[in-house]
């Protein structure tokens, strides 16, 4: 079977199913900047056909952050539906956010690497930020940023935005 991400794009709409990891170390959060854009995101990526969200998270964290995590290292804390219009197209994103305990696996404060995937070549820049620093940057989506700042991780939140 071909490796196929759970996403499709048409002229009038697109759909994406992703997993995202909120990696916490020493009360700081790992954020990602893609190709020098003016905003930040959390590391993650698309789930593949036939892959569970947990398998996808383990794979994506390995690919993007270069650490091995196991099921006991993470737990679901938010289910996010993000529906909005961009360039005359309806964008529909389903994202599952996991709180990831990286332990001592990540020793670096910041780093970059070049990723070459089906969407092209891009530089991914990573850094750990405190909650106070997080308040000052543009982390997308905004509702997730607000959830992180509030530190509401005890249950599973369901957020619909757009």
Task: List each language-model region with its residue ranges.
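Active-site beta-strand termini and strand-to-loop segments that position acidic
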Residues: 23-26, 100-102
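Acidic, metal-coordinating catalytic segment for phosphate/diphosphate chemistry
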Residues: 1-20
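A residue-level structural signature of the nucleotidyltransferase/glycosyltransferase Rossmann-like core
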Residues: 13-14, 21, 39, 126
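Local beta-strand/beta-hairpin segments that build beta-sheet-rich folds
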Residues: 1, 75-77
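Charged phosphate-binding loop/patch that engages nucleotide di/tri-phosphates or the phosphate backbone
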Residues: 137-162
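Short connector loops at helix/strand junctions that flank enzyme active sites
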Residues: 16, 24, 37, 42, ...
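Unchanged
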Residues: 47-72, 81-138
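Conserved Nudix-box catalytic region and its N-terminal flanking loop in Nudix hydrolases
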Residues: 24-64
């Amino acid at each position: 079977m071909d490796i196929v991400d759970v996403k499709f794009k048409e002229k009038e709409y697109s759909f994406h199913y992703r997993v995202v990891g909120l990696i916490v170390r020493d009360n700081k959060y790992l954020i990602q900047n893609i190709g020098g854009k003016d905003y930040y995101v959390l590391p993650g990526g698309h789930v593949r056909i036939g892959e569970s969200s947990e398998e996808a998270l383990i794979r994506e964290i390995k690919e993007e952050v270069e650490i091995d995590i196991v099921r006991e290292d993470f737990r679901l804390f938010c289910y996010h539906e993000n529906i909005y219009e961009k360039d005359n197209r309806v964008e529909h994103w389903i994202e599952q956010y996991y709180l990831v305990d990286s332990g001592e696996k990540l020793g670096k404060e910041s780093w970059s690497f070049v990723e070459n995937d089906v969407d092209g070549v891009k530089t991914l820049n990573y850094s750990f930020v405190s909650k106070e620093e997080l308040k000052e940057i543009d982390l997308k989506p905004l509702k997730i940023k607000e959830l992180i700042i509030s530190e509401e991780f005890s249950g599973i939140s369901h957020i619909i935005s757009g």
